[in-house]
Amino acid sequence: MTDVLRSLVRKISFNNSDNLQLKHKTSIQSNTALEKKKRKPDTIKKVSDVQVHHTVPNFNNSSEYINDIENLIISKLIDGGKEGIAVDHIEHANISDSKTDGKVANKHENISSKLSKEKVEKMINFDYRYIKTKERTIHKRVYKHDRKTDVDRKNHGGTIDISYPTTEVVGHGSFGVVVTTVIIETNQKVAIKKVLQDRRYKNRELETMKMLCHPNTVGLQYYFYEKDEEDEVYLNLVLDYMPQSLYQRLRHFVNLKMQMPRVEIKFYAYQLFKALNYLHNVPRICHRDIKPQNLLVDPTTFSFKICDFGSAKCLKPDQPNVSYICSRYYRAPELMFGATNYSNQVDVWSSACVIAELLLGKPLFSGESGIDQLVEIIKIMGIPTKDEISGMNPNYEDHVFPNIKPITLAEIFKAEDPDTLDLLTKTLKYHPCERLVPLQCLLSSYFDETKRCDTDTYVKAQNLRIFDFDVETELGHVPLVERPAIEERLKHFVSAPSSSL
């Protein structure tokens, strides 16, 4: 990439204060302090905004928290009293259902109310009632959502009728259940997510999905409500169907003791950043739970969609947010330092962790707790500088960490090409202001292989149309005078491996 183009990209990305509040220093506020503030609830409010299966760190006592980190660093990173740690001392936890939240849709506490095991079983049986009564077809009156115009027929007082065969439960967890079926009227396969609806609030995931219209985000087709015999209300989201999650795809190769093809990883990564570029700039939404289980793929076409918007939120600089968000292995360091005015860049960190996991076949950072997760990051990334610590939490800047020699990303990914290392290095940064934004990631030469006209990948790229951008929406945040150079780079195809800008 030319110096001029780099300058343009940096300028448009870091001067756009509406897109990212990068000029604002990350501010920290304890969760306890936030709870004491008397604020009116949001119009769209979730019952729970935290993942309840982890212990929340005590950010209120910063000295105690930072001392725990220092003690763990001393015990885990100082080998035999000597500075430094050998590369072969890295021990990533094996991927398992218990550590990585299992198969697709196994753990989605952020979607809605956390449900008991008995409640989930009841929801599953509630869907099976059609089978028990030998009904072959289910008929529902639903609200049809029009993605292009961002309206649904409920707003106009109208509904439509759909029918589908008895469903098959393909996933369930503390959030509810997911089933697959085929809409008879359209002959289209869909996934239906059923969650318990709290009557007091709007469902944030539903309201978020009404805002989305992008090929790399799972689409909302219909939604409807139904009651059980105890008069409890369930929201059903009828969504685009995808064959499997990225987690399941990775497990396929891990079980075969094979690596996922590098070009396949690049296709998924490109579409991930393309989706984030859209989310962060059009509806201005931060997903806040990017992980392999929430990324859906079709391996036959390399198509890709982000799902599960139960944690998604429009981040505003004047409104604090909970810091205990996002699954642990993919949680940005500022969140572990208790940041409440964080930016959309938490999604970029999570995305980099996903790419690294696809390359390694296991999580890059796999801590056993929140503090241990931070130690795992320090083990590889090194001790954060005073400025980086201040950017994550000013309360910690006077603490001095033990001096250790980190295991670098270059050591871990030494078998990968320089472009891969370059992208990971520039997205895995302690300070969110220093991370590439999604558009910068899309311009990386890491993706040039997917644009080569002399390979089979060119056909897949053309079929997916992943290099087609809607200028008014996906590039609408780019200043007019700078768009031509950006568009040229995004659509530039190369004919040989050595060719790059």
From Swiss-Prot:
Report which reactions are catalysed by this protein: L-seryl-[protein] + ATP = O-phospho-L-seryl-[protein] + ADP + H(+); L-threonyl-[protein] + ATP = O-phospho-L-threonyl-[protein] + ADP + H(+)
Q: Which InterPro entries match?
A: GSK-3, Kinase-like_dom_sf, Prot_kinase_dom, Protein_kinase_ATP_BS, Ser/Thr_kinase_AS, STKc_GSK3
Superkingdom in the source lineage: Eukaryota
Residues binding ATP, per UniProt: 170-178, 193
Give the GO terms filed under biological process for this record: cell differentiation; regulation of protein catabolic process; signal transduction
**The Protein kinase domain, residue ranges:** 164-447
Give the annotated active site. 289
- Supply the EC number(s): 2.7.11.1
Q: Which residues carry this modification: Phosphoserine?
A: 13
> What keywords appear on the UniProt entry?
ATP-binding, Kinase, Nucleotide-binding, Phosphoprotein, Serine/threonine-protein kinase, Transferase
Task: Give the signal peptide, or none.
Answer: none
Is ATP-binding tagged as a keyword? yes
A GO MF term? ATP binding
- Record has Zinc-finger as a keyword: no
Q: What is this protein called?
A: Serine/threonine-protein kinase MRK1
Question: Which species is this record about?
Answer: Saccharomyces cerevisiae (strain ATCC 204508 / S288c) (Baker's yeast)
